[in-house]
Swiss-Prot record:
Family per similarity comment: Belongs to the chaperonin (HSP60) family.
Top-level EC class: isomerase
PROSITE patterns: CHAPERONINS_CPN60
GO biological process: protein refolding
Positions contributing to ATP binding: T29, L30, G31, P32, D86, G87, T88, T89, T90, G413, N476, A477, A478, D492
Subunit structure of this chain's protein: Forms a cylinder of 14 subunits composed of two heptameric rings stacked back-to-back. Interacts with the co-chaperonin GroES.
UniProt xrefs under PANTHER family: 60 KDA HEAT SHOCK PROTEIN, MITOCHONDRIAL (PTHR45633)
GO function terms (MF aspect): ATP binding; ATP-dependent protein folding chaperone; isomerase activity; unfolded protein binding
Organism listed in the record: Bacillus cereus (strain G9842)
The protein, known as: Chaperonin GroEL
Function: Together with its co-chaperonin GroES, plays an essential role in assisting protein folding. The GroEL-GroES system forms a nano-cage that allows encapsulation of the non-native substrate proteins and provides a physical environment optimized to promote and accelerate protein folding.
GO cellular component, one term: cytoplasm
Major localisation: cytoplasm
Length: 544
């Protein structure tokens, strides 16, 4: 296929049009008085959202060069979303400002490589200063503030704060669509995995269709149990102790399952068998997690152990186990706290190393199960359109809160970017490097300016006044007042602000150093089919 090539000024101008189109659509959502954007969906109702990355991903432009510019900025939003989970609109606004200012200077004859150096120096200094002024997040109220600002909803802030308090900062918090109108929190404490009882005859509560075991022993193995003789020695020891037993194995079938069910029905002893969770290497890791949590051992041939040699000492213990048709929940495992902490550390290390999104998700789940539990926020709304929009906002708020726990908080409303202004302005540089620093300085003003514009005010007036205010004092666009942002609970996670600035600068620097752009030439329209006049009904008279 033939290619279309544009060079230097013409190439950058074409791409800038795409950058502006996308950024102008995204930036109307910034701040407490930001508007929504409606996205057409091929099927179902349109999606109404104020989430920057969702809007950016939907935009496709007809002109190939403009589309490349738009896609570059969409990449800024997407990367910021991947790293911090929020701040995508801020990242887009920063990228647009840096690209526009940079292009003015390149057109005026500045060397793009010098500008790039200056931009990188300025951003490094800004990030160092952000780290200095960030404050660690403390207590439930701070978490609620971060979440409420991100979701623009205080009720959501309280829900997320409560969820994090219940399951810990490492706990898994998932979102589900509720059948009702209200948004609720449901917490599953302890370790839960998605395997239910091997036979419905093992239930202890026929109303709820679940088996509840109090202070049970837990036999953990990666083997298939089909012969009762294999586990008879350990069964006899458990019966003597007068305690119930949970068996977690690859499978329990045939004669072994039948014998267990018969003894359960006769009331000889209380036993429930479930299949081991996961598959392959992940199954081994999860069984090991359960063993560490309950203070037991995994009976596996890899360690030279067989089921006949198992004793009650090698079994795990827990305060309570609840088994339903689909899930097993182990509560209050009596494992050694030091070993559990070591295991959590090991999983954290794996989390940092992995590049796979799927592996990261699974490791996060394992970490949460060891750390304390899973919280489910059930999102409710009156219509499907509102439900989708609300779910996206809560997802952003959740990511924002996690980022705040990791790296602390800074003043919100774009104030923190203006608070690093003096530090960046003090960098000593000459020529094009100094121009690059000025490009970043101009971009640092842009989020505050846009928040003010969206609130119906004159952006430049707000920016100029903010430059003269003390660190931490900013403009509350929701009320139109000048307040101490941290004290008023208007905060942003430092990680979100840092990621937005870093990613915007990275793409802007690449954009400015672009000298040629190559795109596919649009194909000419295929000629229309020839007229088939002779095939009309009149022309087919001879066929009658």
């Amino acid at each position: 296929m033939a290619k279309d090539i544009k060079f230097s000024e013409e190439a950058r101008r074409s791409m800038l049009r795409g950058v502006d189109t996308l950024a102008n659509a995204v930036k109307v959502t910034l701040g407490p008085k930001g508007r929504n954007v409606v996205l057409e969906k091929k099927f179902g109702s349109p999606l109404i959202t104020n989430d920057g990355v969702t809007i950016a991903k939907e935009i496709e432009l007809e002109d190939a060069f403009e589309n490349m510019g738009a896609k570059l900025v969409a990449e800024v939003a997407s990367k910021t979303n991947d790293v911090a989970g929020d701040g995508t609109t801020t990242a887009t606004v920063l990228a647009q400002a840096m690209i526009r200012e940079g292009l003015k200077n390149v057109t005026a004859g500045a060397n793009p490589m010098g500008l790039r150096k200056g931009i990188e120096k300025a951003v490094t200094a800004a990030i160092e200063e952000l780290k200095t002024i960030s404050k660690p997040i403390e207590g439930k109220s701070s978490i609620a503030q971060v979440a409420a600002i991100s979701a623009a909803d205080e009720e959501v802030g309280q829900l997320i704060a409560e969820a994090m308090e219940r399951v810990g900062n490492d706990g898994v918090i998932t979102l589900e669509e509720s059948k009702g109108f209200t948004t609720e929190l449901d917490v599953v404490e302890g370790m839960q995995f998605d395997r239910g009882y091997a036979s419905p005859y093992m239930i202890t509560d026929s109303d709820k269709m679940e088996a509840v075991l109090d202070n049970p022993y837990i036999l953990i193995t990666d083997k298939k149990i089909s012969n009762i003789q294999e586990i008879l020695p350990v069964l006899e020891q458990v019966v003597q102790q007068g305690k119930p037993l949970l068996i977690i194995a690859e499978d329990v079938e045939g004669e072994a399952l039948a014998t267990l069910v018969v003894n359960k029905l006769r009331g000889t002893f209380n036993v429930v068998a479930v299949k081991a969770p996961g598959f392959g290497d992940r199954r081994k890791a999860m069984l090991e997690d359960i063993a560490i949590l309950t203070g037991g051992e995994v009976i596996t041939e890899e360690l030279g152990r067989d089921l006949k040699s198992a004793t009650v000492e090698s079994l795990g213990r827990a305060g309570k186990v609840v088994v339903t048709k689909e899930n097993t929940t182990v509560v209050e495992g009596i494992g050694n706290t030091e070993q559990i902490a070591a295991r959590i550390g090991q999983i954290r290390a794996q989390l940092e190393e992995t590049t796979s999104e799927f592996d990261r998700e699974k490791l996060q789940e394992r970490l949460a199960k060891l750390a304390g539990g899973v919280a489910v926020i059930k999102v409710g709304a009156a219509t499907e359109t509102e439900l989708k929009e609300r779910k996206l906002r809560i997802e952003d708020a959740l990511n924002s809160t996690r980022a705040a726990v990791e790296e602390g908080i800074v003043a919100g409303g774009g104030t923190s970017l203006m608070n690093v202004y003096t530090k960046v302005a003090s960098i000593v540089a000459e020529g094009d490097e100094a121009t690059g620093i000025n490009i970043v300085l101009r971009a640092l003003e842009e989020p505050v300016r846009q928040i003010a514009i969206n609130a119906g005010l004159e952006g430049s007036v707000v920016v100029e006044r903010l430059k003269g205010e003390k660190v931490g004092v900013g403009f509350n666009a929701a009320t139109g007042e000048w307040v101490n942002m941290l004290e008023s609970g208007i905060v942003d996670p430092a990680k979100v602000t840092r990621s937005a600035l870093q990613n915007a600068a990275s793409v802007a620097a690449m954009f400015l150093t672009t000298e040629a752009v190559v795109a596919d030439k649009p194909e000419p329209n295929a000629p229309a089919m020839p007229d088939m006049g002779g095939m009309g009904m009149g022309g087919m008279g001879g066929m009658m």
